[in-house]
A protein has these predicted regions:
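Secondary-structure boundary elements
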Residues: 93-156, 164, 232-234, 243-257
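Bacterial N-terminal signal peptides
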Residues: 2-10
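Residue-level detector of bioactive/disordered segments in secreted/extracellular proteins
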Residues: 10, 16-17, 160
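Hydrophobic/aromatic-rich core segments of domains that either
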Residues: 161-250
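Intrinsically disordered, low-complexity N-terminal segments that are enriched in acidic
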Residues: 15-88
Length: 257
């Protein structure tokens, strides 16, 4: 198992037109095969993903559908389509309103902040933009903290952005869950068109699940995200999360169309 630092692209204040700086972190990077640059001009992309953990299965998510899954003796191969989809199911969404050790939605500071967005026309977008601007110290290497502490400290990377976003959404009565996976970046740590580890949020609003990424609320492109697992935030490293991260160590991703 490789221990990965949760990293994000675009964590500097890009809303001010600044270029994102390269963060001095150790990151796990996957260089996709095929015409990777084409992903940035597409709305829908199909990937072939291979890895050696036969038990690991990519989830159905807001932005992705598993078209084919073949488990061989030594490895698994998945054909995955990413991009806009009609993921409307709300089954079991009630549990995504609960508090957890990291989503401490009972804390007064979290409840009061969430209340500001309850009656807005777009609470999901409003909370995403708030978190993006509120976390001003965009840095990595912070131990996983509860949302109330993140709200106070105003520091962190994609993990802290996602925890605070999910907590505020739940406190506002909107089911929300955190997702771990990879996102495609035009450039990261001197390498172009690569997938890097990332965390984001899915929120159930308006009768459907939607993707919310408070590290880049103005720059969400659904085909650039690949979800590996949902993080329960009951513990720092739940089993589904560990399995997903383990599969990253030998994964190959190829854009096929």
């Amino acid at each position: 198992l490789i221990l990965l630092t949760a990293i994000c692209i675009g964590l500097t204040p890009c809303c001010k037109g600044e270029h994102a700086s390269v963060l001095p972190v150790t990151a796990f990077i996957i260089e996709p095969e095929g015409d990777a640059a084409a992903v940035f001009s597409e709305k829908i992309t199909t990937f072939r993903i291979s890895y050696q953990d036969r038990e690991f299965v990519l989830p159905r998510a807001v932005n992705q559908v598993v078209l084919e899954h073949k488990a061989g003796e030594l490895s698994s191969t998945v054909i995955l389509r990413t991009g806009p989809s009609a993921y409307l199911t709300g089954t079991g969404r009630g549990r995504y309103l609960d508090a957890t050790p990291y989503l401490d939605i009972h804390k007064m500071a979290v409840k009061e902040k969430a209340a500001l967005f309850i009656k807005s026309g777009d609470p999901v977008g409003g909370i995403s933009h708030f978190v993006h601007g509120h976390i001003t110290d965009k840095k990595t290497g912070i131990p996983m903290l509860p949302a109330s502490v993140i709200l106070q400290n105003r520091a962190g990377d994609c993990t802290e952005h996602s925890i605070l976003t999910a907590a505020l959404l739940r406190a506002a009565g909107i089911p929300a869950r955190c997702v771990t996976g990879v996102i495609m970046a035009r450039e990261f740590s001197g390498r172009r068109n690569v997938f890097v580890y990332h965390m984001w949020v899915e929120a159930y609003y308006g009768g459907r699940w939607i993707l919310a990424d408070s590290t880049r609320p103005e720059d969400v492109h659904l085909n650039r995200y690949i979800a590996f697992a949902y993080h329960s935030l009951e513990t720092e490293t739940p089993l589904d999360y560990i399995a997903a991260i383990s599969s990253l160590t030998d994964m190959t991703i190829r854009r096929i169309r």
